[in-house]
């Protein structure tokens, strides 16, 4: 690996070597690489319940008012599985005394937007039927998972219209949204325009690249895959982007949009879109906080047994405690 001109935490450098190229233009190769890297069976400490919609870790001695933490996996919207995060989610269930739900959302391009967002909502609705509607909810996502977390919360709060606007659906969304206490967005992937400074500065990564992002966004929105040259800029209609990731508006506070914790990496093409989201929420009157740890890069925030992951868990723990 060539030496980076940017500071990277030494403890995280092995991640770059171990991570296969994110070939969103060649999904069979990308998915196979992810399977080889991440598909290591985890022996759960807590009780694990698996349904078609997701995987739930339930800690022993579960409190009646224990929260539900929805933990949405990343993968550029086109790869990954809920089981890949079993070790992390099992750990979070123990640490927070929470039911940790990882939705098994369907992947693009086979299932483009809004299907993955609706799958996450359906997984949460199913969990509430099983575990009760009296529990506070927190929503956590990493990278594309953070994008789905934000899009999911916006949909539940009525900031974008669901495909089916029947009264029963709207009433269910209103009930669920009233229970959400906070949303945690780690290195969020929410801006398909590829127009930020960091998108250009870190076009070659490490790990997540501008070309990978262009392919992922084409797949997510069900559009033709751009050529490498075309992928340098976005041709996704603005109205389509807004339907998935609406920019913060002044009325967000009025609808009770939940507090947000946003974490970005200094060396990441997605850095500036996360910063823009956090400041946009603040400018809209919402409660939001923004963190950036020196030397992190895309995909490095939850590396097991790292100081970085300890810092992130502490942030999440404090945020959940304050907003419970």
Task: For each feature predicted by the language model, list its residue ranges.
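Alpha/beta hydrolase fold serine-hydrolase catalytic domain that processes acyl esters and thioesters
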Residues: 8, 26, 35-37, 133-135, ...
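Active-site glycine-rich loops that stabilize anionic/oxyanionic intermediates
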Residues: 73-79, 267
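A fold-wide structural signal in alpha/beta-hydrolase
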Residues: 68, 97-101
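Short beta-strand element of the alpha/beta-hydrolase
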Residues: 65-74
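Gly/Ala-rich beta-loop-alpha elbow adjacent to hydrolase catalytic centers
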Residues: 141, 145, 149
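Catalytic nucleophile-loop/oxyanion-hole region of alpha/beta-hydrolase
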Residues: 81-82, 88, 101-136, 304-310
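Short beta-strand-to-loop junctions in surface cap/lid or active-site-entrance loops
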Residues: 53-65, 248-252
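A glycine/proline-hinged amphipathic helix-loop "lid/cap" segment
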Residues: 1-60, 224-233, 237-238, 324
């Amino acid at each position: 690996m060539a030496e980076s001109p940017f500071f990277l935490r030494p403890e995280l450098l092995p991640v770059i070597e171990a991570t296969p190229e994110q070939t969103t233009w060649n999904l069979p190769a990308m998915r196979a690489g992810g399977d080889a890297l991440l598909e290591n069976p985890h022996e759960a400490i807590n009780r694990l319940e698996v349904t078609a919609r997701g995987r739930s870790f339930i800690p022993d001695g579960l409190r009646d008012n224990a929260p539900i933490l929805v933990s949405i996996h990343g993968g550029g919207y086109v790869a990954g599985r809920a089981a890949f995060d079993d070790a992390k989610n099992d750990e979070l269930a123990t640490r927070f005394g929470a039911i940790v739900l990882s939705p098994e959302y369907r992947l693009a391009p086979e299932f483009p937007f809004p299907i993955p967002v609706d799958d996450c909502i359906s997984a949460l609705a199913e969990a509430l039927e099983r575990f009760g509607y009296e529990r506070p909810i927190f929503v956590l996502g990493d990278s594309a998972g953070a994008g789905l977390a934000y899009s999911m919360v916006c949909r539940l709060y009525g900031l974008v219209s669901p495909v089916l606007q029947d009264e029963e659906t709207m009433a269910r969304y209103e009930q669920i949204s009233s229970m959400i206490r906070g949303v945690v967005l780690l290195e969020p992937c929410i801006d398909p325009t590829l127009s930020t400074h960091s998108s250009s500065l870190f076009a070659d990564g490490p790990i997540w690249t501008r070309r990978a992002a262009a392919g992922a966004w084409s797949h997510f929105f069900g559009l033709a895959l751009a050529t490498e040259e075309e992928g340098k800029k976005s041709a996704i209609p603005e109205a389509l982007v807004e339907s998935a990731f609406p920019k913060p508006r002044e009325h967000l506070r009025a609808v009770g949009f939940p507090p947000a914790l946003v974490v970005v990496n200094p060396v990441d093409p997605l850095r500036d879109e996360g910063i823009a989201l956090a400041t946009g929420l603040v400018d809209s009157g919402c409660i939001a906080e923004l963190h950036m740890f020196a030397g992190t890069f895309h995909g490095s925030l939850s590396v097991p047994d790292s100081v970085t992951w300890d810092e992130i868990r502490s942030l999440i723990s404090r945020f959940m405690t304050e907003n419970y």
